Each structure stands twice: as C-alpha cells, then as structure tokens.
C-alpha cells in the first residue's frame, strides 16, 4: 500500500498543473535502517476523497461538547449566584478536565498539521480570531481580558511549524523524537508559570517580564481569563506533530477513518465556529432567562 502511494505521488508530480504540495520538494520520503516515513501520504487520501479522519473529528466533537457544558455551568453561576453551590458539585467533578481537554485539543492540532494543505493560512486565521477575542474580552472584562489564550497559542505554534518543519524534515528524525521531545518539554515546564523549571526555582531576574507573557515565564501581575503560553503547552503541539506522523499513515490510518459516531464527527468538524460562538450564545440566553424571571 505504501509502495502504491509513492508511485501515485511520483506520477502526479510529473504532470502539468500539479498542485504545489506534489511538486518536487513537496513531500519527503526518508528511509533509515528501520523506518520509512511518508509525510504527504495523506495527500493521496485527499485525492481519493478521504481527507477527513473520522476518529479525529469524533474526538474533537467530544472535547468541544465538554467545553460547552463546562462554560455553561460557569456562566449559570455568574447569572444565578444562588445556584453556584449545587452546580459546582458537578463542576468540581469535571474540574480536572480544565487541563485535559485543552491539552488534547492542542495535541490534535499538532496531529492535523499533516492533514492541512495550508498551515500558514490556519495559523493566520487563528491569529486573527485570537486578536478579536483579545479586543472583545478587553471591552467586556477590562480587568481580566484574554491576553494569550488557546487561539493565540495555536496561532503561534502553527506559524512556528511552518517556519521549522522543512529544516527538521531534512534531519530525518523518526516520529518518536517529536513525541518524546514534546512530552519532555511539557513535563519540564509544566510549573514554569509558578516559577519552577524541572522542579527547580527560576532566578528572580526571570520573574515579572510582561513582554515574555507569551513564553510562560512567571508574572505576579498577570491577569488573564484564559492563559495558554508556549511553555508548557507548545510541547503538546510538537508531540502531536510526531504522533500524527506516526498514526496518520498505514496501517493505523485505515482504523482512524472508520466512524463510530457520525453525529459526534459532524460536531467535531465545526469546533472553531462553536468555540467562537458558544459564549455569546450562553450569555444572551442566560441574560434573557434572568430578565424573564425578574
């Protein structure tokens, strides 16, 4: 199956008007003693009409559903404070998901760099939406705006990936290198915001550098409603890039394309739109409900 995919790519490269991603240099076939990696195998799947990976869409759908539920619970406590004690009994049960859910989203975004034809465009769109969220949150909540949220992080990671993936590809690193390296980076810098690197305290000179807010260094004056700096969360993105390079090729790709929950997969195809729109919808609905009940 891999051999057929390579032959297909080679034939298409020699034809006129060949898409850019199939032109020479548009894909990498690197062979080591034990490894064959085909970074553009998924381009063949797109040409055959199988660009969507059902299991990834289903996981994204489940994750965005958890985000919607969690934010709804939080918003209800804002509009109806008397309900807070009872609601947060349920909220406490899913509180650990505050780290797990965005972490999985970031991991999936790294995986999907191998599925997108234009990651630069994805990164610029994320940057545009992140800027809009920063502006709106500064108006709605000037004391605690979203200064560097998850969309800021994804935009930065995607743009960094666009700049670095070709030089890294020329090094012929196996997928596990990115997975292990990204995982270690995440683990070593997980408490960086609290002032620790690999369990050791950071020097005082690195504290309170607001211009390095995006990096994740500790800042006691930081007030942000949603904060996902490059360290540690960028480590999960790079781990996802390696995981995608491994899983999104045969034989694993065939299993991931099999859908078990079409409804959840449809939900997962619109995660960005749902993420951008759900809070205004919750706020408007709860405001109307509170107004109706006096």
Regions found by a protein language model. Give the residues of each.
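Alpha-helical transmembrane segments and their immediate juxtamembrane cytosolic regions
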Residues: 16, 29-294
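Positively charged N-terminal leader segments that act as targeting/secretion signals
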Residues: 2, 8, 13-28, 32-35
């Amino acid at each position: 199956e891999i051999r057929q995919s390579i032959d297909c790519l080679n034939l298409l490269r020699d034809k006129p008007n060949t898409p850019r991603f199939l032109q020479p240099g548009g894909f990498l076939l690197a062979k080591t003693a034990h490894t064959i990696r085909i970074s553009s195998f998924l381009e063949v799947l797109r040409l055959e009409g199988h660009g969507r990976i059902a299991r990834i869409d289903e996981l994204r759908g489940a994750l965005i559903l958890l985000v919607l539920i969690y934010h709804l619970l939080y918003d209800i406590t804002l509009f109806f404070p008397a309900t807070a004690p009872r609601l947060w009994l349920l909220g406490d049960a899913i509180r650990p998901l505050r780290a797990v859910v965005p972490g999985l989203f970031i991991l999936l975004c790294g995986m999907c760099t191998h599925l997108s034809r234009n990651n630069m465009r994805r990164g610029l769109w994320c940057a545009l939406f992140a800027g809009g969220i920063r502006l709106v949150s500064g108006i709605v909540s000037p004391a605690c705006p979203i200064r560097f949220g998850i969309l800021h992080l994804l935009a930065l990671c995607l743009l960094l990936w666009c700049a670095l993936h070709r030089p890294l590809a020329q090094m012929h690193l196996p997928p596990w290198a990115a997975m292990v390296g990204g995982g270690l980076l995440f683990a070593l810098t997980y408490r960086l915001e609290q002032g620790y690197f690999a369990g050791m305290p950071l020097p005082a000179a690195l504290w309170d550098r607001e211009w390095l807010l995006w990096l994740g260094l500790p800042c006691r004056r930081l007030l942000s409603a949603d904060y996902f700096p490059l360290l540690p969360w960028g480590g999960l993105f790079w781990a996802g890039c390696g995981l995608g390079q491994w899983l999104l090729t045969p034989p694993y790709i065939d299993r991931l394309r099999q859908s078990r929950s079409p409804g959840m997969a449809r939900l997962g195809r619109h995660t960005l739109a749902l993420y951008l729109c759900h809070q205004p919808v919750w706020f408007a609905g709860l405001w109307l409900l509170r107004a109706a009940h006096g």
